[in-house]
């Protein structure tokens, strides 16, 4: 078991230095339209017991903040949600919920974790390594190895909880965490069922949007620019980050506007969800292809949920084509990509519950 979080860190300032796009890709470039620099230390918050989520607390669920360490030695911070009046004389199914790229556990993944706890599951929503309240330095980077490992670390943690049946642990990944969850389940058979929502394949988003791989010369040019930036940073220059812009312009594309409406408005904004990611991490996604071996998850089940109108729907369609049975693609009528982050009247809660009830049964 982990411990209650009792750590404080300095707050840092974030400074925008322009809105030009570094990446020329329709998807990842649109979702990360600003270039930013950050001061030396990441922003953290001390846990005081005050509710700090973008959604209301449930009277049917007990919440506490926990910490545990992944295989890479990174301290992960998670919110744990447990149904009230849980029968502790028996063990229960559990779920690990991963947040979207650039998000934090106080947003979408926390909403999913709390809502599934209302439906009888023990759940955790963690901050990915190098993000939110979790450890890892420097902050605001994304490593495929680390974020995949974070899911397995969640299985480690839940499997030691006396209330949890370690043979009945499932995973929900939203947006980029959907791709990470599929990759994690391929190599960790302890994850007995996997559901994704509005899934993104970050390797495809950054380097092969809709299957159209970046031209070799453009790819080489971008890698060279990132290499030069690494030398600059090693010599003391400010780090460069991609993030959503702080304001919209008439030229802002539709995908960026969709993300902006969540991350940059009271709807979903959170002080630790900067959306910023250090550009030096992008080359690590060049060979990240979570669908190539998705059939390895079988005979464990996969449920892929996508909005009918989601710009990301094709990722789920690509994955379902390569997955082996049992598998299901569930399309939410009238929903877009970000709609399934927080619009509780559109999120198919009953579908998620029935899926995990069936496949995490005793």
Regions found by a protein language model. Give the residues of each.
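N-terminal secretory signal peptides
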Residues: 1-21
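N-terminal cap/lid segment of alpha/beta-hydrolase-fold proteins
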Residues: 49-90
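The serine-hydrolase catalytic nucleophile loop
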Residues: 102-114
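Conserved alpha/beta-hydrolase
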Residues: 117-133
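Alpha/beta-hydrolase active-site loop
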Residues: 142-161
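Alpha/beta-hydrolase-fold enzymes
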Residues: 182-262
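Short beta-strand/loop motif that positions the catalytic acidic residue
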Residues: 304-306
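Catalytic histidine-centered segment of alpha/beta-hydrolase-like enzymes
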Residues: 335-345
């Amino acid at each position: 078991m982990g411990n209650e979080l009792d750590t404080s860190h300095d707050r840092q300032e974030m400074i925008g230095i322009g809105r030009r796009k570094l990446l020329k890709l329709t998807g990842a470039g649109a979702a990360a339209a600003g270039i930013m620099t950050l001061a030396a230390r990441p922003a953290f918050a001390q846990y005081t017991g005050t509710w700090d989520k973008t959604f209301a607390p449930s009277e049917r669920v007990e919440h506490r903040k926990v910490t545990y360490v992944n295989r890479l030695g990174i301290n992960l911070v998670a919110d744990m949600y447990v149904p009230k009046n849980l029968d502790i004389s028996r063990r229960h199914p559990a779920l690990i919920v991963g947040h979207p790229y650039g998000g934090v556990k106080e947003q979408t993944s926390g909403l999913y974790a709390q809502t599934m706890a209302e439906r009888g599951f023990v759940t955790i929503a963690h901050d990915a390594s190098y993000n939110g309240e979790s450890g890892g330095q420097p902050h605001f980077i994304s490593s495929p190895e680390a974020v995949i490992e974070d899911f397995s670390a969640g299985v480690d943690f839940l499997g030691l909880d006396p209330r949890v049946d370690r043979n009945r642990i499932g995973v929900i990944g939203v947006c980029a965490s959907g791709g990470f969850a599929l990759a994690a389940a391929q190599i960790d058979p302890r994850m007995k069922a996997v559901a994704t929502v509005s899934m993104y394949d970050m390797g495809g988003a950054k380097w092969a949007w809709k299957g159209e791989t970046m031209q070799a010369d453009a790819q080489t040019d971008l890698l060279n620019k990132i290499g030069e930036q690494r030398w600059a940073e090693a010599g003391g220059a400010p780090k460069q980050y991609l993030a959503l812009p702080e304001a919209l312009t008439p030229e802002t594309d539709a995908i960026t506007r969709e993300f902006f409406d969540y991350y940059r408005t009271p709807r979903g904004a959170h002080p630790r969800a900067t959306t910023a990611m250090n550009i030096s991490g992008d080359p690590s996604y060049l060979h990240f292809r979570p669908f190539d071996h998705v059939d390895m998850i079988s005979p464990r089940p996969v449920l892929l949920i996508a909005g009918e109108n989601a710009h990301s729907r094709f990722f789920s369609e690509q994955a379902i084509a390569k997955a082996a049975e049992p598998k299901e693609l569930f399309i939410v009528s009238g929903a877009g990509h970000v709609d399934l982050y927080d619009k509780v009247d559109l999120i198919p809660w009953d579908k998620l519950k029935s899926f995990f009830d069936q496949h995490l049964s005793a």
